[in-house]
């Protein structure tokens, strides 16, 4: 029964993330509300921060990026806090089987395949950043440095995103990275008593990240083709319109 309840609870979190958070695509909503436009009709036709940067400028893109990161990170932290600090939930016998990052997976998938926009959304990179921070802040710092290095040299944002998605797979599967002190947010079981049962399931977060990384890489398939053909666009900022 533990396995069944665990699956049902985490499936509910996944659907919550997919339908109520991920499927509300930030760049589509803002482009329609603020610009009376649709971001998906411009440049790469992608509903994400990079295309927002090219189409509407840095300020618009920063808002999109920050919102996409936070719409993944904050709900994960809220679920974690509820499970750990609300007595009624904490006393629930299956609370220790809840993986808050199941919600994050739903957000990433919803962002890429939004239910309310004909399943045509972004590439999931910014939302995955929120997931990364929730797993371990050190992973985010590693990702940030790799991204800066790659984009600084190549001037190609997509190459930076692709490299980060691949590179973090080397780190996220280290058990100490998941449940060590710097994994405090949702994984450090010595600090989050409700998740002590998950100590034997440390690989849950790496599996969730691996799924997200795979989706991010698949969503960059056209970028792969342009990189191979050496026709990928380099970094450029459009003035706000």
Curated annotation (Swiss-Prot):
Keywords, ordered alphabetically: Cell membrane, Lipid biosynthesis, Lipid metabolism, Membrane, Phospholipid biosynthesis, Phospholipid metabolism, Transferase, Transmembrane, Transmembrane helix
GO molecular function (one): acyl-phosphate glycerol-3-phosphate acyltransferase activity
Transferase recorded as keyword: yes
Ranges annotated as spanning the membrane: 3-23, 63-83, 97-117, 131-151, 156-176, 198-218
GO cellular component, one term: plasma membrane
Reactions mediated catalytically: an acyl phosphate + sn-glycerol 3-phosphate = a 1-acyl-sn-glycero-3-phosphate + phosphate
Keyword Cell membrane belongs to the record: yes
Membrane topology designation: Multi-pass membrane protein
Recorded superkingdom: Bacteria
Listed EC numbers: 2.3.1.275
InterPro entries: G3P_acylTferase_PlsY
Biological process annotations from GO: phospholipid biosynthetic process
Localization per record: Cell membrane
Pathways per UniProt: Lipid metabolism; phospholipid metabolism
The protein's assembly and partners: Probably interacts with PlsX.
Function: Catalyzes the transfer of an acyl group from acyl-phosphate (acyl-PO(4)) to glycerol-3-phosphate (G3P) to form lysophosphatidic acid (LPA). This enzyme utilizes acyl-phosphate as fatty acyl donor, but not acyl-CoA or acyl-ACP.
Family affiliation: Belongs to the PlsY family.
NCBIfam families: glycerol-3-phosphate 1-O-acyltransferase PlsY
Protein name: Glycerol-3-phosphate acyltransferase
Underlying gene: plsY
